[in-house]
Curated annotation (Swiss-Prot):
EC numbers on record: 4.3.2.10, 3.5.1.2
Gene: hisH
Pathway entry: Amino-acid biosynthesis; L-histidine biosynthesis; L-histidine from 5-phospho-alpha-D-ribose 1-diphosphate: step 5/9
InterPro entries per the UniProt record, alphabetical: Class_I_gatase-like (IPR029062), GATASE (IPR017926), Imidazole-glycPsynth_HisH (IPR010139)
Domain (Glutamine amidotransferase type-1) ranges: 1-206
Main localization, broad class: cytoplasm
Signal peptide residues on this chain, from the entry's feature table: none
Keywords (A to Z) from UniProt: Amino-acid biosynthesis, Cytoplasm, Glutamine amidotransferase, Histidine biosynthesis, Hydrolase, Lyase
Catalysed reactions listed for this entry: 5-[(5-phospho-1-deoxy-D-ribulos-1-ylimino)methylamino]-1-(5-phospho-beta-D-ribosyl)imidazole-4-carboxamide + L-glutamine = D-erythro-1-(imidazol-4-yl)glycerol 3-phosphate + 5-amino-1-(5-phospho-beta-D-ribosyl)imidazole-4-carboxamide + L-glutamate + H(+); L-glutamine + H2O = L-glutamate + NH4(+)
UniProt-recorded name of the protein: Imidazole glycerol phosphate synthase subunit HisH
Organism field: Listeria monocytogenes serotype 4b (strain CLIP80459)
List of catalytic residues: 79, 181, 183
Amino acid sequence: MIVIIDYDTGNTKSISKALDFIGLQNKISSDKTEIAQADGVILPGVGAYPEAMQELTRRGLDKTLKEIATAGKPILGVCLGMQLLLESSNEHSYTKGLGLIPGHVEMLPDESEFAVPHMGWNQLQIKRTTPLTQNIAGEYVYYVHSYYANCPEAYIIATSGYSIDIPGMINNGNIYGAQFHPEKSGQIGLEILKGFKEVIRSCKSSQQ
Protein backbone atom coordinates (compact mmCIF):
# COMPACT_ATOMS: atom_id res chain seq x y z
CA MET A 1 0.00 0.00 0.00
CA ILE A 2 1.22 3.46 -0.93
CA VAL A 3 -0.08 6.57 0.82
CA ILE A 4 -0.61 9.92 -0.89
CA ILE A 5 -0.17 12.48 1.87
CA ASP A 6 -3.17 14.76 2.36
CA TYR A 7 -2.27 18.06 4.00
CA ASP A 8 -4.80 20.29 2.21
CA THR A 9 -2.32 21.56 -0.37
CA GLY A 10 -2.07 18.97 -3.11
CA ASN A 11 -3.70 17.42 -6.16
CA THR A 12 -4.24 14.09 -4.38
CA LYS A 13 -7.17 12.72 -6.41
CA SER A 14 -5.52 13.01 -9.82
CA ILE A 15 -2.41 11.25 -8.49
CA SER A 16 -4.57 8.52 -6.97
CA LYS A 17 -6.33 7.95 -10.30
CA ALA A 18 -2.97 7.65 -12.08
CA LEU A 19 -1.78 5.09 -9.52
CA ASP A 20 -5.04 3.15 -9.91
CA PHE A 21 -4.42 3.06 -13.66
CA ILE A 22 -1.00 1.38 -13.24
CA GLY A 23 -2.32 -1.04 -10.62
CA LEU A 24 -0.61 0.45 -7.58
CA GLN A 25 -2.82 0.17 -4.51
CA ASN A 26 -3.01 3.55 -2.83
CA LYS A 27 -4.79 5.59 -0.19
CA ILE A 28 -5.09 9.32 0.45
CA SER A 29 -4.43 9.96 4.13
CA SER A 30 -3.20 12.47 6.68
CA ASP A 31 -3.02 9.88 9.47
CA LYS A 32 0.55 9.60 10.76
CA THR A 33 0.21 5.91 11.63
CA GLU A 34 -1.11 4.99 8.18
CA ILE A 35 1.63 7.02 6.53
CA ALA A 36 4.35 5.45 8.67
CA GLN A 37 3.09 1.95 7.86
CA ALA A 38 2.94 2.53 4.09
CA ASP A 39 5.34 0.79 1.72
CA GLY A 40 6.00 4.16 0.10
CA VAL A 41 4.58 7.67 0.08
CA ILE A 42 3.88 10.43 -2.40
CA LEU A 43 4.06 14.04 -1.23
CA PRO A 44 2.04 16.23 -3.62
CA GLY A 45 1.79 19.98 -3.40
CA VAL A 46 0.46 23.14 -5.00
CA GLY A 47 0.65 26.68 -3.66
CA ALA A 48 3.27 28.46 -1.59
CA TYR A 49 6.23 26.84 0.15
CA PRO A 50 5.96 28.56 3.57
CA GLU A 51 2.29 27.68 4.07
CA ALA A 52 2.81 24.09 2.88
CA MET A 53 5.76 23.53 5.19
CA GLN A 54 3.85 25.13 8.06
CA GLU A 55 0.93 22.76 7.48
CA LEU A 56 3.19 19.69 7.37
CA THR A 57 4.80 20.77 10.63
CA ARG A 58 1.46 21.56 12.30
CA ARG A 59 0.29 18.03 11.57
CA GLY A 60 3.59 16.46 12.66
CA LEU A 61 4.07 15.06 9.17
CA ASP A 62 7.53 16.60 8.81
CA LYS A 63 8.82 14.22 11.50
CA THR A 64 6.91 11.30 9.98
CA LEU A 65 8.48 11.91 6.56
CA LYS A 66 11.96 12.10 8.04
CA GLU A 67 11.37 8.81 9.88
CA ILE A 68 10.18 7.18 6.65
CA ALA A 69 13.28 8.42 4.85
CA THR A 70 15.55 7.12 7.63
CA ALA A 71 13.83 3.72 7.37
CA GLY A 72 14.73 3.62 3.68
CA LYS A 73 11.16 3.62 2.40
CA PRO A 74 10.57 5.29 -0.99
CA ILE A 75 9.28 8.86 -1.13
CA LEU A 76 8.20 10.74 -4.26
CA GLY A 77 7.62 14.50 -4.07
CA VAL A 78 5.60 16.10 -6.87
CA CYS A 79 5.84 19.79 -7.87
CA LEU A 80 5.81 21.76 -4.59
CA GLY A 81 6.12 18.40 -2.85
CA MET A 82 9.49 17.94 -4.53
CA GLN A 83 10.64 21.38 -3.40
CA LEU A 84 9.68 20.58 0.20
CA LEU A 85 12.19 17.71 0.14
CA LEU A 86 15.03 20.24 -0.08
CA GLU A 87 16.77 22.08 2.74
CA SER A 88 15.15 25.49 2.36
CA SER A 89 13.32 28.01 0.17
CA ASN A 90 13.34 31.78 -0.33
CA GLU A 91 9.74 31.91 -1.59
CA HIS A 92 8.28 35.02 0.09
CA SER A 93 10.63 34.49 3.05
CA TYR A 94 13.32 32.04 4.14
CA THR A 95 11.73 28.74 5.16
CA LYS A 96 13.39 25.52 6.25
CA GLY A 97 12.39 22.41 4.33
CA LEU A 98 12.55 18.72 5.13
CA GLY A 99 16.26 18.51 4.28
CA LEU A 100 16.01 15.08 2.65
CA ILE A 101 17.83 16.21 -0.52
CA PRO A 102 20.56 18.88 -0.50
CA GLY A 103 19.55 22.12 -2.17
CA HIS A 104 17.61 25.37 -1.97
CA VAL A 105 14.46 26.56 -3.74
CA GLU A 106 14.80 29.81 -5.71
CA MET A 107 12.61 31.80 -8.09
CA LEU A 108 13.10 31.25 -11.81
CA PRO A 109 14.94 34.12 -13.54
CA ASP A 110 12.46 36.70 -14.82
CA GLU A 111 13.49 37.19 -18.45
CA SER A 112 11.32 38.62 -21.21
CA GLU A 113 11.56 35.59 -23.49
CA PHE A 114 10.87 33.10 -20.68
CA ALA A 115 7.57 33.62 -18.88
CA VAL A 116 7.23 33.02 -15.16
CA PRO A 117 5.48 30.83 -14.17
CA HIS A 118 6.94 28.14 -16.39
CA MET A 119 3.74 26.53 -17.60
CA GLY A 120 3.10 23.85 -20.19
CA TRP A 121 4.96 21.03 -21.89
CA ASN A 122 8.75 20.86 -21.92
CA GLN A 123 11.24 18.23 -22.97
CA LEU A 124 12.89 16.09 -20.32
CA GLN A 125 16.61 15.38 -20.71
CA ILE A 126 17.80 12.37 -18.72
CA LYS A 127 21.06 12.91 -16.84
CA ARG A 128 21.19 9.65 -14.89
CA THR A 129 19.41 6.33 -15.22
CA THR A 130 17.24 5.34 -12.27
CA PRO A 131 14.16 3.09 -12.04
CA LEU A 132 12.05 6.20 -12.68
CA THR A 133 13.97 7.29 -15.78
CA GLN A 134 15.04 4.00 -17.36
CA ASN A 135 12.13 3.84 -19.82
CA ILE A 136 12.09 7.48 -20.94
CA ALA A 137 14.31 9.47 -23.28
CA GLY A 138 13.57 13.02 -24.37
CA GLU A 139 9.79 12.97 -23.98
CA TYR A 140 7.71 15.97 -22.93
CA VAL A 141 6.19 16.47 -19.48
CA TYR A 142 3.82 19.05 -18.02
CA TYR A 143 5.09 21.83 -15.73
CA VAL A 144 3.41 24.58 -13.67
CA HIS A 145 5.83 26.40 -11.36
CA SER A 146 7.62 29.67 -10.62
CA TYR A 147 10.36 28.31 -8.36
CA TYR A 148 12.99 25.66 -9.00
CA ALA A 149 15.31 23.36 -7.08
CA ASN A 150 18.87 24.69 -7.02
CA CYS A 151 20.69 21.56 -5.91
CA PRO A 152 24.07 19.88 -6.53
CA GLU A 153 24.41 18.19 -9.91
CA ALA A 154 24.95 14.79 -8.29
CA TYR A 155 21.28 14.76 -7.21
CA ILE A 156 19.78 15.84 -10.55
CA ILE A 157 18.57 12.96 -12.71
CA ALA A 158 16.69 14.94 -15.40
CA THR A 159 16.44 18.55 -16.59
CA SER A 160 14.35 20.71 -18.93
CA GLY A 161 15.72 23.70 -20.79
CA TYR A 162 14.24 27.13 -20.05
CA SER A 163 15.86 30.38 -18.88
CA ILE A 164 18.06 27.92 -16.97
CA ASP A 165 18.37 24.14 -17.02
CA ILE A 166 15.53 23.34 -14.64
CA PRO A 167 16.02 20.24 -12.50
CA GLY A 168 12.98 18.25 -13.59
CA MET A 169 13.76 15.23 -11.44
CA ILE A 170 16.02 14.81 -8.42
CA ASN A 171 17.05 11.80 -6.36
CA ASN A 172 18.81 10.87 -3.13
CA GLY A 173 18.73 7.14 -2.37
CA ASN A 174 15.09 6.05 -2.29
CA ILE A 175 13.88 9.65 -2.24
CA TYR A 176 12.73 11.07 -5.58
CA GLY A 177 11.27 14.35 -6.74
CA ALA A 178 9.51 15.48 -9.92
CA GLN A 179 9.09 19.22 -10.53
CA PHE A 180 6.55 18.49 -13.27
CA HIS A 181 3.26 16.65 -12.80
CA PRO A 182 3.54 12.95 -13.77
CA GLU A 183 -0.20 12.55 -13.30
CA LYS A 184 -0.79 15.21 -15.99
CA SER A 185 1.96 14.07 -18.37
CA GLY A 186 0.17 11.28 -20.22
CA GLN A 187 1.86 7.96 -20.92
CA ILE A 188 5.33 9.21 -20.02
CA GLY A 189 4.07 10.27 -16.60
CA LEU A 190 2.62 6.81 -16.08
CA GLU A 191 5.99 5.26 -16.99
CA ILE A 192 7.64 7.38 -14.30
CA LEU A 193 5.05 6.27 -11.74
CA LYS A 194 5.62 2.66 -12.82
CA GLY A 195 9.29 3.23 -12.05
CA PHE A 196 8.38 4.39 -8.56
CA LYS A 197 6.24 1.26 -8.22
CA GLU A 198 9.33 -0.79 -9.04
CA VAL A 199 11.36 1.05 -6.39
CA ILE A 200 8.69 0.17 -3.82
CA ARG A 201 8.65 -3.48 -4.90
CA SER A 202 12.45 -3.69 -4.71
CA CYS A 203 12.52 -2.11 -1.25
CA LYS A 204 9.88 -4.50 0.06
CA SER A 205 11.83 -7.48 -1.26
CA SER A 206 15.08 -6.34 0.35
CA GLN A 207 13.39 -5.82 3.72
CA GLN A 208 11.84 -9.29 3.84
